[in-house]
Regions:
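Amphipathic, small/basic residue-rich leader segments at the start of a protein or domain
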Residues: 1-133, 149
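Hydrophobic alpha-helical transmembrane segments of multi-pass small-molecule transporters/permeases
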Residues: 47, 137-140
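Phosphate/diphosphate-binding loops
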Residues: 139-140, 144-152
Length: 152
């Protein structure tokens, strides 16, 4: 049975990222220096917590019951519950969408910042997050290995 309550403590994550790890060195790299400061992680974690509590976790039941459905025939498709779209749009609008797929894009978040966000999201709704990861993995395979014709 899917859980419907999300409890999480961000204090330890903030400590590990800001005090224990040498994040100043990381965010001084060319890929991040024009986009992030060390205190930006607080906002990302706080927003992620609220989205996990208020949006992802309540959608967790839909992820399990009825869950996704495969539609066969001439058009192969996977149909997701209606709540998936709202969750995905909310997460992306907050700037917390998948960060793994195209690491060459400017403004991407350091993965050491995204990992605890993904951990929170996974705790709030494992099925939804695994669906995203599967999709991101397929996208990465296509980006790195497919012909230009298929990419278009």
């Amino acid at each position: 049975m899917a859980h419907e309550t999300f409890m999480y403590q961000t204090r330890d994550l903030k400590f590990a990222i800001k005090e224990w790890l040498d994040m100043e060195k990381l965010i001084s790299c060319d890929a991040y220096k024009d986009y992030y400061g060390i205190d930006d992680i607080d906002g990302f974690l706080d927003v992620s917590f609220k989205i996990c509590r208020d949006v992802l976790c309540p959608a967790n039941k839909d992820a399990d019951e009825p869950g996704c459905k495969h539609v066969g025939g001439d058009t192969q498709a996977v149909i997701t519950p209606d709540s998936f779209k709202n969750v995905y749009n909310t997460v992306c609008e907050a700037g917390l969408g998948p960060q793994f797929a195209n690491r060459s894009e400017e403004g991407r978040m350091p993965l050491s910042w995204y990992a605890p966000i993904l951990e929170m999201q996974s705790g709030a709704s494992p099925a939804i997050v695994m669906f995203w990861c599967l999709t991101a993995g397929a996208t990465t395979v296509i980006q790195n290995n497919a012909s230009e014709e298929l990419k278009e």
